[in-house]
């Protein structure tokens, strides 16, 4: 069954030339495209570049001929931009409200948009959630902070919405600067109305309730479960009702009150890997009920990341930590295949992407290391663009899209399938 699910996952990824959400078509950071660029610089192998007004942690979202960007236009205003992927020209801009501010590394443009090819949904760190069509016509808008209270995260809200079929799934896990409860909600994507909203209580204290992760889905037989990490726990929820089905603990064994989680869970089949604040990183099998800490925990590893979300093809799992130390693990067992291996020194906030048999990972200085996605460590290239980078690379039709503080770069030549 697991092999069949993995085959289905890989086939669906291969058919997708779009990058419709933060971690790509299957929420795993994987593209099955081939013949992608390996080398570039500020002047080499750049098809076009578009000036950006400010940095962001949001990833470019791509559908056919259009790119969608969450943009902090200045110290106050936020906007959703639509860009022509053929030449980098801005097609339209739609306001996403005011209230932008700097929160440590972040500003309020950090959540990535999502699209189904007919509509685009954009969420900001100020709580504005808006649906527009591909021409920018507004379908609906909500102000989540106005409805449910201010987001209380120490570093500002940064979780992206999860789009699945007819619904958006949004988490607000916080506690550092608020006494309001954390919650998860499902919205009808066409109306913006709640299907459900459930609170998600934990025993986490001070900053530990804060989670900057994005939800994912784990498949159990013919059904799917919503997986949320944060507040020192991992939880699985029923898609229809939001009811918590299972909970795994052990992510904060020392009871550190500043144990916020940034790196998101990644799932293939019924197995989900959940990073925390470096250690421990754990894998759980979906489908349990109640406390699954012992019954469904598959493995534990103490060499996880803090900020970059790991990437997997369902067989191997590649991890790059904040200091540029890389590991390769067996996805199913957690056994280390290789590592620690040093890539270019620096601070890493972007997440690695797997494509064309290669891992692409960019540090905050704009250096993208390309290393082979295999059970043997081999650096293939180091590509330098001297600019500040928090955003992860997006892949579409043979091209790479890298967003820096000053520019959005389109790298390589397009090859339509």
Q: How should these model regions be labeled?
A:
Residues 2-13:
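Bacterial N-terminal signal peptides
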Residues 15-417:
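Noncatalytic, solvent-exposed loop/strand surfaces
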């Amino acid at each position: 069954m697991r092999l069949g699910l993995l085959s289905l996952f890989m086939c669906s990824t291969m058919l997708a030339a779009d990058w419709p959400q933060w971690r790509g078509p299957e929420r795993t950071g994987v593209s099955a495209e081939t013949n992608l660029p390996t080398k570039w610089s500020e002047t080499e192998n750049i098809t076009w570049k578009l000036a950006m007004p400010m940095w962001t942690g949001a990833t470019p979202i791509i559908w056919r001929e259009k790119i969608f960007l969450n943009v902090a236009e200045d110290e106050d205003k936020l906007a959703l931009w639509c860009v022509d992927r053929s030449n980098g020209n801005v097609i339209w801009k739609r306001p996403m409200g005011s209230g932008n501010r700097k929160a440590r590394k972040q500003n309020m443009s950090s959540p990535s948009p999502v699209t189904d090819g007919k509509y685009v949904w954009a969420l900001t760190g100020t709580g504005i959630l808006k649906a527009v069509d591909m021409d920018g016509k507004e379908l609906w808008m909500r102000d989540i902070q106005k409805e449910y209270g201010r987001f209380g995260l120490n570093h500002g809200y940064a979780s992206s919405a999860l789009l699945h079929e007819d619904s958006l799934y949004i988490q607000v896990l916080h506690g550092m600067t608020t006494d309001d409860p954390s919650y998860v909600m499902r919205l009808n994507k066409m109306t913006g109305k709640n299907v459900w909203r459930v609170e998600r209580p934990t025993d986490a204290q001070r900053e530990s309730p804060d989670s900057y992760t994005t939800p994912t889905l784990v498949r159990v037989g013919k059904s799917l479960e919503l997986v949320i990490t944060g507040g020192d726990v991992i939880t699985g929820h029923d898609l229809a009702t939001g009811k918590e089905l299972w909970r795994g603990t052990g992510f904060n064994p020392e009871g550190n009150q500043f144990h916020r989680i940034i790196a998101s869970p990644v799932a293939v089949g019924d197995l989900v890997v959940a990073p925390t604040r470096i250690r421990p990183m754990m894998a759980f099998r979906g489908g349990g009920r109640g406390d699954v800490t012992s019954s469904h925990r598959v493995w534990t590893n103490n060499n996880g990341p803090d900020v970059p979300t790991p990437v997997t093809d369902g067989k191997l799992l590649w991890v790059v930590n904040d200091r540029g130390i890389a590991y390769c693990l067996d996805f199913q067992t957690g056994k280390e295949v290789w590592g620690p291996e040093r890539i270019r020194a620096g601070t890493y906030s972007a997440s690695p992407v797997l494509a064309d048999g290669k891992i692409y990972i960019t540090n905050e200085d704009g250096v993208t290391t390309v290393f082979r996605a295999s059970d043997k460590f081999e650096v293939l290239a180091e590509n330098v663009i001297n600019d500040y980078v928090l955003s992860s690379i997006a892949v579409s039709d043979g091209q790479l899209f890298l967003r820096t503080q000053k520019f959005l770069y389109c790298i390589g030549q397009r090859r339509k399938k």
